[in-house]
Amino acid sequence: MVDVGDKTTTRRRAVAAGTFHTTTKVIDLLRESALPKGDVLATARIAGIMAAKRTDALIPLCHQLALSAVDVDFTVADDHIDILATVETAGKTGVEMEALTAVAIAGLTL
């Protein structure tokens, strides 16, 4: 793991995006709140946030970070759902991996 001990603590922010492709039928069910597993967007949002907080356990050689904010947002279109994760911290290393992990796990949860 890279030694970041001598780096200066600064505000850090990363944004990652992804797209979940599906059918119009699934999107219609989602919009009607008729999916059998309930509110999938809320579940995927929570999964993405939890994943960002656990990135160091999921990705080898990632530093454990105290995150100050994690937001996972969705934009629902006719045949896909766009996922946008924003992660912030005040630390010695960036939060890019945490943002990417949030998007990946939110997408898998969908």
Residue ranges and their predicted role:
Residues 1-41, 46-63, 68-109:
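C-terminal binding/interaction regions
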